[in-house]
């Protein structure tokens, strides 16, 4: 298998596990605060990462790698809170699509500047992949927006934050993936706890930690796959394929909750498969 094929495969695994994480978090959010679920997942997965790193006696990387990871974890958690706020304001379908597109577009632009232009086939795959992300992420939710323009602005800001996190994670992973994940998770826990402290959850649910464990674990595994993918190939390829994670959420919702995807989302999934084939070449 070529390095591009391996990177694409790891990117797909990242998208699948991130999609599962979002599904678990979304399911739990029907019963408890999404921030409470996120906080519990971050804390519990951090404990697991610390145990693994210490048990394996992994060498702690240089401070710069840990700092990059911590910045990515902190600003990614803040971006998540901003994204939740944007969705709550309305224009949910368009906001989610814009966030997904910006998440992939930021590392694509960064890598084009930093690494130069890829082959024509890769460029075509990236373009199709970005279109797929837009279609997959767009949901038919009722708009009823409190402030559509502000919701879209916050959604775009969240997407930029998520995209920046992908860039930072690639840099941090060069020093050691597991310690990078741990550093990012520590900073993420701090950020989420700050957000929860400023806006205490109103819907406690004794079983929220179950959704938190599943969501947090899958999110950490998805981060692991993404970091590995980013080390084996171009950043833009890893970022675009990994950003197709809403497809995994949609498929799980269809299988478990019997929720049918829209024609737009089905078309997006088809384009995503075509994009992956091109990016694996």
Predicted regions and their residues:
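Helix-loop junctions at the membrane-solvent interface of multi-pass transporters
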Residues: 17, 52-56, 112-117, 135-139, ...
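Membrane-interface interhelical linkers
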Residues: 1-17, 24-25, 29-71, 80-90, ...
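Selected transmembrane alpha-helices and immediately adjacent juxtamembrane segments
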Residues: 148-179
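Hydrophobic/small/kink-forming positions within alpha-helical transmembrane segments
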Residues: 15, 19, 23, 50, ...
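Hydrophobic/aromatic residues within transmembrane alpha-helices
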Residues: 28, 37, 86, 91, ...
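Hydrophobic transmembrane alpha-helices of multi-pass small-molecule transport proteins
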Residues: 49, 105-109, 118-139, 264-281
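Alpha-helical transmembrane segments of compact multi-pass small-molecule transporters, enriched
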Residues: 43-49, 98-112, 187-191, 222-226, ...
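Hydrophobic/aromatic positions within or immediately flanking transmembrane alpha-helices
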Residues: 11, 35-39, 69, 93-97, ...
């Amino acid at each position: 298998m070529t390095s591009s094929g391996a990177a694409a495969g790891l990117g797909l695994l990242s998208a699948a596990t991130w999609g599962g994480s979002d599904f678990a978090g979304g399911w739990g959010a029907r019963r408890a605060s999404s921030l409470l679920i996120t906080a519990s997942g971050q804390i519990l997965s951090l404990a697991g990462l610390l145990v693994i790193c210490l048990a394996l006696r992994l060498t702690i990387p240089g401070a710069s790698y840990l700092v990059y990871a911590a910045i990515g974890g902190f600003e990614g958690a803040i971006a998540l809170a901003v994204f939740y706020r944007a969705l709550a304001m309305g224009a949910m379908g368009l906001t989610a699509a814009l966030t997904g597109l910006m998440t992939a577009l930021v590392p694509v632009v960064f890598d084009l500047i930093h690494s130069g232009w890829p082959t024509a086939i890769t460029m075509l795959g990236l373009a199709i992949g970005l279109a797929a992300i837009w279609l997959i992420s767009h949901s038919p939710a009722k708009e009823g927006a409190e402030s559509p323009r502000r919701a879209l602005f916050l959604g775009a800001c969240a997407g930029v934050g998520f995209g920046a996190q992908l860039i930072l994670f690639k840099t941090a992973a060069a020093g050691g993936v597991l310690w990078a994940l741990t550093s990012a998770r520590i900073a993420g826990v701090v950020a989420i706890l700050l957000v929860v402290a400023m806006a205490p959850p109103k819907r406690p649910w004794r079983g929220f930690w179950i959704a938190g464990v599943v969501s947090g674990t899958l999110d950490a595994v998805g981060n692991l796959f993404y970091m590995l993918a980013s080390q084996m190939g171009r950043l833009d390829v890893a970022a675009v394929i990994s950003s197709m994670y809403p497809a995994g959420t949609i498929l799980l919702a269809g299988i478990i909750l019997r929720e049918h995807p829209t024609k737009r989302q089905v078309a997006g999934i088809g384009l995503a498969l075509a994009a992956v084939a091109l990016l694996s070449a």
